[in-house]
Amino acid sequence: MDIDQYMTDVGRRARRASREIARASTAAKNAALEAVARAIGRDADALKAANARDVARAKDKGHDAAFVDRLTLSDKALKTMIEGLRQVATLADPIGEMSNLKYRPSGIQVGQMRVPLGVIGIIYESRPNVTIDAAALCLKSGNATILRGGSEALESNTALAKLIGEGLAAAGLSQDAVQVVGTADRAAVGKLITMTEYVDVIVPRGGKSLIERLINEARVPMIKHLDGICHVYVDDRASVAKALAVCDNAKTHRYGTCNTMETLLVARGIAPAVLTPLGRLYREKGVELRVDADARAVLEAAGVGPLVDATDEDWRTEYLAPVLAIKIVDGIDAAIEHINEYGSHHTDAIVTEDHDRAMRFLREVDSASVMVNASTRFADGFEFGLGAEIGISNDKLHARGPVGLEGLTSLKYVVLGHGEGRE
């Protein structure tokens, strides 16, 4: 296969389809989503058979249990796909919304209209459910999509692509509006991320090595996040009860997510009251504690152990595991400075009963999501009321934070006049 020519053809078809899908009615887009949902339910056995072949190959290659679990399309996973498609169909369609309409002294009316981005390339790894999640959000937001999943899920993704195509056709929409790259050749990714004439934005969903490669090689703009080094700062004016609840959930609710707390900062004046019960709780749950000298002194005095001495690298690490770095700081100044120096601009929280300090933290911490008296685990499109998300961005342009339907759109200016000319 000539990968360059193949991907060029995919891009050309996507660009053509993007113009059609951009003007599609809400009813047509929702009908397509419902048709795909029905098709998944109808062909569940065929989907599971295709997926079983992917899973067998993954096991033969020695992939671990966690990888195989992400790859597997269980009955529950298929049900979640169907529910997700129907949920996206219920979301308000942002396309065509008019906002900020104002009359100017010249007599013209100026405002903004929400429009699709165009063609979105999604690059992801072993989760075939992303094929449906991404296709649904891009379709509802009026975008064409090129989906490049991991080679290990090729048969699963191909089977899902067939059903998506059927759903589009049933609604009278171009099947080229959602295309799954039908090759495992890594050169396809290299071509996709450089096709600026056909692709408007890339959304990568994968591990750090994938994101780093795309940062170095992509010519197409990206909506991405590299790391989720999330902090909770417990202020010396915090409620101890709130601090325990927030810090427990932020770390132990799930270890492998990008919005899990990786570093705990505690004000010196409240450290014994907070770290003593927290340290015991974390050790009971099997969390390894990597601590600075001051935190070690407090925890050892409380009989908490074993402890590991933190290094500078620990403050820069996204563990995605039951490991937590702990540092005692002098106060909010030092906490904000530490977060802005070592954090990844993803999600950070303060626990405090002081309103002025809370507002200062919100203003000065340079992250996509900043929270007061709440767990970092809330940094999620569903929890934010977006309905669904395609990912989380810790960049400042174009979207920031959880990216839902609006994050897959742009605003263009519109001018309404009555024959006016500029003087």
Swiss-Prot record:
Catalyzes the NADPH-dependent reduction of L-glutamate 5-phosphate into L-glutamate 5-semialdehyde and phosphate. The product spontaneously undergoes cyclization to form 1-pyrroline-5-carboxylate. GO terms for molecular function: glutamate-5-semialdehyde dehydrogenase activity; NADP binding. Its EC number is 1.2.1.41. HAMAP family: ProA (MF_00412). Its main location: cytoplasm. It catalyses: L-glutamate 5-semialdehyde + phosphate + NADP(+) = L-glutamyl 5-phosphate + NADPH + H(+). GO terms for cellular component: cytoplasm. The keyword GTP-binding does not apply. It is found in: Cytoplasm. The lineage of its organism: Bacteria, Pseudomonadati, Pseudomonadota, Betaproteobacteria, Burkholderiales. Keywords: Amino-acid biosynthesis, Cytoplasm, NADP, Oxidoreductase, Proline biosynthesis. Pathway: Amino-acid biosynthesis; L-proline biosynthesis; L-glutamate 5-semialdehyde from L-glutamate: step 2/2. This is Gamma-glutamyl phosphate reductase. Belongs to the gamma-glutamyl phosphate reductase family. It is an enzyme of class 1 (oxidoreductase). GO terms for biological process: L-proline biosynthetic process.
